[in-house]
Amino acid sequence: MAKNKKLFEYLSQHAETISSTWYETIEETDPNSIYASTDPVVIHNLKSQNLAFNYKINRIFIDDEDVYLPILKEWAFEVTQDQEHLKTPIHYIIREFVRVRDLYVSYVKEFVHLNQNTVKSEEAEDLYHALIKAFDLVIHIFIEEMYKNTSLQLQAQKDMITELSAPVIVLFHSVGLLPLIGDIDTVRAKLIMENTLHQCAKKKVTQLYIDLSGVAVIDTMVAHQLFSLIEALRLIGVSSTLSGIRPEIAQTAVQLGLSFEGISLRSTLASAIASDLKLKKV
């Protein structure tokens, strides 16, 4: 990387001007973009982040890559944690990186012009190349950090959806309820199995009501998954009761030759709970 302490000092002296010029020339109308915000706090943070970046990128002209690169990575990591940046489409952010880079190129050109007696054309080309390379590195780092952050958010959302698709609700003490609603295919049945076992163990549930009143259709594969769930629950010390089996499912079960032998059944969830409470009182 080309070194030039005088250029570093020149850019550092103009860092605030570069930042101000950049912000004042933003043209943004998309309300989803951080660059269109009118919130004073958001604006202040955005300006501070940009100015901090300017001071850090300037160091490419005095430091080796193994020194300045971790500093730029740390800046990129912090900015990609910012909710306002996370809400902003990535192509807007890249556009602003390019605008800042173009401003820097103009300042480097001005520096070369002011110091044409000492900065030769070959050295000037090296300085331009160093600047472009540094910005390319930062953009790459930023996109990578944004991808990591977005992936973590998507995984968290996926985990939440999975949990909500088969929520184990603690009714009282160690008694829980698993209300199943909607269509259940083999993929969802597998998620229900994994999530239910995990939640029962986590919430210390020893008795679980599995209510099927919201399920209209069930096939052989899903039924076997359901039976496997009940058996797996038994192995971890959880007794299960099926309730709310609709007539359509009962008819399908008979036609498919499915057996509910050995499984505790109740017509409704209310009757299942009432029956168990009555037995406990006796």
Curated annotation (Swiss-Prot):
It comes from the Bacteria. The modification Phosphoserine is found at residues 165, 174. Residues 165-276 form the STAS domain. Keywords: Phosphoprotein. InterPro entries: Bact_StressResp_Reg (IPR051932), STAS_dom (IPR002645), STAS_dom_sf (IPR036513). Phosphorylated by RsbT. Disruption phenotype: Cells lacking this gene have no visible phenotype in response to salt, ethanol or energy stress. However cells with multiple disruptions (RsbRA, RsbRB, RsbRC and RsbRD) have an increased basal level of sigma-B, indicating this protein is a negative regulator of sigma-B. The modification Phosphothreonine is found at residue 186. One of 4 functionally non-identical RsbR paralogs, it functions in the environmental signaling branch of the general stress response. Negative regulator of sigma-B activity. Non-phosphorylated RsbS binds to RsbT, preventing its association with RsbU. Requires any one of RsbRA, RsbRB, RsbRC or RsbRD to sequester RsbT. When RsbS and the RsbR paralog(s) are phosphorylated, they release RsbT, which can then bind and activate RsbU. Probably present in the stressosome with RsbRA, RsbRB, RsbRD and RsbS. PANTHER family: RSBT ANTAGONIST PROTEIN RSBS-RELATED (PTHR33745), RSBT CO-ANTAGONIST PROTEIN RSBRC (PTHR33745:SF3). This is RsbT co-antagonist protein RsbRC. It comes from Bacillus subtilis (strain 168).
